[in-house]
């Protein structure tokens, strides 16, 4: 018991000393705009996002096995995509370039299956119908696919880390604009269970 108490007090002392140093450094060291933006405002700039990912836990949790499974899953899905659409061609070319996957051949299973697996269902299909420019279609569909990074989705996080074309803010603006352009949302009735306080059990 005495041993554990000694370790506890030692850890508390070390923590207090480290906190003191951190406080001193915070007072004497100027904070760069990059650090301030990424820490407090969570800027969506692609460069800052990549820096945060490389320096954070996201990079540490990506093991070679995870990347292998990620590549295998994407390769499997890409093999099923129909290459008839120019928008799908552009989108697939970006994914292949991003992950270094070589895809040969195709079937008519198409992009909808890939979209369903990533959880965006019919949104990308509706976007493709409304947007005529193939390049914009590719960007919008890609944005819908990698958007789940906001829910800390592992696959979406890795895609976002490697994707040099779109920022999170651009994805949000494009997806929201396209969803709201022709779809008028009906007001939902009040749901008591949504607003009720949640008690976590430990």
From Swiss-Prot:
It is found in: Secreted; Host nucleus. GO terms for cellular component: extracellular region; host cell nucleus. Residues 37-48 have a biased composition (Basic and acidic residues). A motif (RxLR-dEER) lies at residues 49-61. Keywords: Host nucleus, Secreted, Signal, Virulence. The keyword Transit peptide does not apply. Transmembrane segments: none annotated. Residues 29-58 are annotated as: Disordered. Residues 1-16 form the signal peptide. Its main location: secreted. Belongs to the RxLR effector family. The RxLR-dEER motif acts to carry the protein into the host cell cytoplasm through binding to cell surface phosphatidylinositol-3-phosphate. Secreted effector that completely suppresses the host cell death induced by cell death-inducing proteins. This is Secreted RxLR effector protein 93. It comes from Plasmopara viticola. The gene is RXLR93.
């Amino acid at each position: 018991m005495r041993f554990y108490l000694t370790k506890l007090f030692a850890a508390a002392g070390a923590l207090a000393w480290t906190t003191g140093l951190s406080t001193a450094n915070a007072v004497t060291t100027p904070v760069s705009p990059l650090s301030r933006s990424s820490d407090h405002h969570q800027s969506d700039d692609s460069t800052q996002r990549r820096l945060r990912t490389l320096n954070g836990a996201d990079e540490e949790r990506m093991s070679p096995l995870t990347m292998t499974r990620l590549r295998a899953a994407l390769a499997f899905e890409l093999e099923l995509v129909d290459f008839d659409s120019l928008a799908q061609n552009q989108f697939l070319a970006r994914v292949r370039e991003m992950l270094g996957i070589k895809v040969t051949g195709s079937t008519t299973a198409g992009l909808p299956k890939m979209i369903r697996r990533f959880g965006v269902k019919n949104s990308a299909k509706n976007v493709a119908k409304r947007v005529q420019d193939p390049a914009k279609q590719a960007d919008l569909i890609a944005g819908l696919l990698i958007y789940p990074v906001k829910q800390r989705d592992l696959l979406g996080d890795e895609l976002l880390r490697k994707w040099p074309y779109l920022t999170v803010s651009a994805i949000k603006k494009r997806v929201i604009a396209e969803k709201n352009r022709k779809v008028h949302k009906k007001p939902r009735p009040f749901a008591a269970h949504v607003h009720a306080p949640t008690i976590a059990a430990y």
